[in-house]
Design a protein with these regions (language model features):
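Active-site-proximal beta-strand/loop segments in catalytic clefts of secreted hydrolases
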Residues: 14-18, 63-65, 92-96, 126
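Surface cap/lid and interfacial helix-loop subdomains adjacent to catalytic sites
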Residues: 41-56, 76-169
Length: 169
């Protein structure tokens, strides 16, 4: 059971993933080359979903880590104006989006609060700034999932956990 299953019809593609060794190499050319194989599977699955199952309904894209990269690439290269009008939001958790990407792709829009639609909800969780992967050094998209703010004000979960954003990193 997933977070969205009570309110959504859930579709999740099977796709080939690149190994952790590839990601840990920090070799962006190697990562990109290997990711393209996985991404072809994601594109085929999204197109099949759109053409056979969506039927004009609102939809959410969601992915974590490599899946978040796939979501970002779908937004860059597969989303058309017709498709975009049905997009509620894209959860791209655990990956990076640069300012250059935001400036270059019209469907990469950063969430600024809880009422935004057609936006990317993204963040990377770490216990301390030193733990941030070099792959995420230029990330610009971040919203606190506990309070839906993009500033440093802390959000508190119903379980008492506190999370805050450091806008300087």
């Amino acid at each position: 059971k997933n977070v969205l299953s009570d309110s959504c019809t859930f579709f999740s593609p099977y796709y080939r993933q690149i190994s952790m060794d590839s990601w840990l190499s920090l070799d962006t050319a190697l990562i990109e080359k290997r990711f393209q194989l996985a991404y072809k599977d994601v594109v085929a699955a999204f197109r099949y979903y759109w053409n056979n199952y969506n039927q004009g309904r609102p939809f959410i894209l969601a992915g974590h880590s490599q899946g978040a990269k796939a979501v970002i690439e779908l937004l860059k290269h597969e989303i058309t104006p017709e498709i975009y009008q049905h997009l509620v939001a894209s959860y791209a958790i655990g990956y990076t989006i640069t300012q250059e990407e935001l400036d270059s792709y019209p469907y990469l829009r950063m969430a600024k609060d809880s009422t935004d639609v057609g936006v990317i909800i993204g963040f990377n969780s770490v216990t301390k700034p030193e733990a941030i992967s070099p792959l995420f050094k230029n990330n610009i998209v971040c919203i606190n999932p506990l309070n839906w703010k993009t500033d440093a004000s802390p959000g508190v979960s119903y379980q008492g956990f506190t999370a805050s954003i450091d806008p300087s990193i």
